Structure formats: structure tokens, C-alpha cells
């Protein structure tokens, strides 16, 4: 959902949407934290060794774990103070991890659901993420091309 804010702003011209991006990203981290805590508590009773074994052996758990771990620095550095401390360029570079995070989260969902059910819903999320990333790549390519002319 966070990845949709910038393309929606570009397409609609409603620049106020950017004000909600941080909040939506933090909600995503909150959801991921609850999801991880539930997994860690109910599936492993806070046993680190058992959890790590699960992360190591089950690909969908590995993908979910990667997505969660990558979200931690994004949430921690989401404040204006961290933007100033890191500098805009380094902060932007760090926050590009959201693209890998989104792909890992979709992969986690796809692998988990496809074990028991046809993967229709995860496929829709994968298509959405692919379209959003393609749109960003196309826009960046068009911008670079326009600046060269």
C-alpha cells in the first residue's frame, strides 16, 4: 500500500498524499511486528533456536523473515530527525529497501498460500507490486531521457 502513494500522487497531482506515506509505512511495520510476534509466540513459544530452524528450513518463513528484518531500519529511520542525520541521499538509498521488502512479502504470502490453496490472491499482489515497480522504472527512465535531451 505504501508503494502506491507516489504513483497515485504522480497520476492525480494530489501532492497531499505524500503526507500519509510515512503513516502507512509505519502501519505496515506495526502489522509486520504483530505478525512476527504471533508467529514467534504461538508457533515457537519464544524459542529462538526453533524459530531460527524454521527460518532456515522453510522458504516462505525465510521470505517473511527477510521482509520483516528489512522493515526494521525503515521504521527506525522514518522520522525527520533521521532524515537530517543520515542526509537525504543516504536516507533515500536506505529506504529503497522497501522494494526488496515488498517483493519478499509477496513471495512469503505466495509461498504460504500456495501450499494449501490456489495462489490467486497472492498473484494479484505480485502483479500489483510488479506494476508499481515498472511504473517507477518507466518514470525514472523517462526523466533521465528528458534531462539528456
Features from the language model and the residues they span:
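Membrane-embedded alpha-helical bundles that constitute the cytochrome b-like, heme-associated redox core
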Residues: 1-149
Amino acid at each position: 500500500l505504501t508503494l502506491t502513494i507516489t504513483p497515485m500522487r504522480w497520476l492525480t497531482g494530489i501532492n497531499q498524499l505524500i503526507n500519509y506515506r510515512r503513516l502507512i509505512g509505519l502501519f505496515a511495520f506495526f502489522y509486520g511486528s504483530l505478525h512476527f510476534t504471533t508467529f514467534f509466540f504461538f508457533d515457537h513459544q519464544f524459542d529462538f533456536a526453533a524459530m531460527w530452524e524454521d527460518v532456515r528450513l522453510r522458504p516462505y518463513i525465510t521470505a517473511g523473515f527477510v521482509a520483516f528484518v528489512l522493515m526494521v531500519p525503515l521504521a527506525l529511520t522514518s522520522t525527520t530527525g533521521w532524515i537530517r542525520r543520515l542526509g537525504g541521499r543516504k536516507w533515500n538509498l536506505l529506504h529503497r529497501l522497501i522494494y526488496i521488502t515488498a517483493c519478499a512479502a509477496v513471495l512469503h504470502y505466495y509461498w504460504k498460500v500456495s501450499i494449501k490453496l490456489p495462489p490467486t490472491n497472492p498473484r494479484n499482489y505480485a502483479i500489483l507490486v510488479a506494476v508499481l515497480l515498472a511504473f517507477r522504472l518507466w518514470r525514472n527512465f523517462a526523466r533521465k531521457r528528458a534531462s539528456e535531451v
